[in-house]
């Protein structure tokens, strides 16, 4: 795409979810890519930080946050800034934005909430729309759609509309889970990211504790059968035509890939994954098929399980705003596929303008 003038990119980051600091780290990476030697003559930047209370902070101060080299503790001082608050719909700062780049992970961001708000500005955004974001975040809806389309998944149960403050309810549900699924199981909030609120349970008492932990985050819960698997991931970019990255694998020393493992220095990311070409092509085909099924476009990361003994492939989930941190798989996948972070960010902007 030929650009005649600098495009103003509006980065939105922070937010009220438990992934607040991950969002800040992702935004810093994108900010550095936009001011790189490759991109600095192509783009202008406005940034909008949303603090933990849901308050939008003005662009000048938000850019200061992205320029900070300190650790995440520095952001605590930005939680109470009554004189720097802005009203989204009435503020002139938003009128000069050409393209939005929302980097809000988790609830009130990745779930389509921010996409709906930004639609009122009538400006393009990087990523998919409201419906794809909402379904991609909701593990129950996503799994039900995949089941209807015979996309392979691990066996699962969905729990909705139960009062898990009642011990008898938790006890009865744990019995049902043991009857219907092989142990161990993974108990997950339906709407959560970065493995927050997820537990591995090997017996009834652990299931009861896991249900309580998940319910504290979301009243809707998914229980999945645990298998002996490798964890593989594929990046997706594009609109009408979706392109896939190389396949990556996450190797970890812990019992399973929990929140601490995801952001641990002990992880090993292997790109390309040590798999044969047939499995690689199957994963890429399933990644495109699943994104099409949920109306997901722009960019996403699709996660898979590869059962070690049977070599069966199972789709795990789709992340519609995958992490852009220095430890995140998505930019690493595309770097291995020929796009460094500066090129990747510019490519995503071009894709949004072509949509």
UniProtKB/Swiss-Prot annotation:
The EC number of this protein is 6.3.2.4
From which domain of life does this come? Bacteria
Tell me the residue numbers annotated for binding ATP.
178-233
Q: Domain ATP-grasp spans what residues?
A: 143-350
Q: Give the subcellular location.
A: Cytoplasm
Q: Which InterPro entries did the record assign?
A: ATP-grasp (IPR011761), ATP_grasp_subdomain_1 (IPR013815), D-Ala_lig_Van_CS (IPR000291), D_ala_D_ala (IPR005905), Dala_Dala_lig_C (IPR011095), Dala_Dala_lig_N (IPR011127), PreATP-grasp_dom_sf (IPR016185)
Stored Pfam families? Dala_Dala_lig_C, Dala_Dala_lig_N
UniProt: Mg(2+) 2 binding residues: 317, 319
* NCBIfam families (alphabetical): D_ala_D_alaTIGR, PRK01966.1-4
> What family, per the record?
Belongs to the D-alanine--D-alanine ligase family.
Purpose of the protein? Cell wall formation.
What is this protein's name? D-alanine--D-alanine ligase
To which species is this protein native?
Answer: Prochlorococcus marinus (strain MIT 9515)
């Amino acid at each position: 795409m030929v650009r005649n003038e600098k495009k103003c990119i509006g980065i939105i980051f922070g937010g009220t979810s438990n992934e607040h600091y991950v969002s800040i780290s992702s935004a810093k990476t994108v900010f550095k890519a936009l001011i790189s030697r490759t991109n600095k003559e192509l783009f202008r930047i406005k940034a909008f930080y949303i603090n933990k209370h849901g308050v939008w902070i003005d662009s000048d101060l938000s850019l200061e946050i992205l320029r900070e080299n300190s650790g995440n503790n520095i952001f605590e001082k930005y939680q109470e800034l009554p004189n720097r608050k802005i009203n989204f719909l009435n503020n002139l700062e938003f009128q000069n934005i050409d393209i939005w780049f929302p980097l809000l992970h988790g609830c009130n961001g990745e779930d389509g909430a921010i996409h709906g708000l930004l639609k009122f500005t009538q400006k393009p955004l990087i990523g998919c729309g409201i419906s794809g974001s909402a379904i991609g975040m909701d593990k129950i809806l996503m799994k039900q759609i995949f089941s209807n389309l015979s996309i392979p998944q691990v066996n699962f149960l969905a729990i909705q509309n139960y009062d898990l403050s009642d011990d008898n309810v938790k006890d009865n549900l744990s019995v049902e889970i043991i009857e219907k699924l092989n142990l161990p199981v993974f108990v997950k909030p339906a709407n959560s990211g970065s493995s927050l609120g997820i537990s591995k349970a090997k017996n009834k008492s652990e299931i009861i504790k896991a249900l309580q932990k998940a319910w504290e985050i979301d009243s809707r819960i998914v229980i999945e059968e645990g298998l002996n698997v490798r964890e593989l991931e594929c990046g997706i970019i594009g609109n009408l035509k979706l392109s896939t990255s190389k396949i990556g694998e996450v190797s970890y020393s812990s019992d399973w890939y929990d929140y601490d493992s995801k952001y641990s220095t002990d992880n090993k990311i292997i790109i390309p994954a040590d798999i044969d070409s047939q499995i690689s092509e199957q994963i890429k085909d399933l990644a495109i098929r699943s994104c099409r099924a949920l109306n997901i476009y722009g960019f996403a990361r699709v996660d898979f399980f590869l059962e070690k003994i049977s070599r069966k492939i199972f789709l795990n989930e789709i992340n519609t705003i995958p992490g852009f941190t220095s430890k995140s798989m998505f930019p690493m996948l595309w770097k291995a596929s020929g796009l460094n972070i500066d090129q990747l960010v510019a490519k995503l902007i071009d894709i949004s303008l072509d949509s």
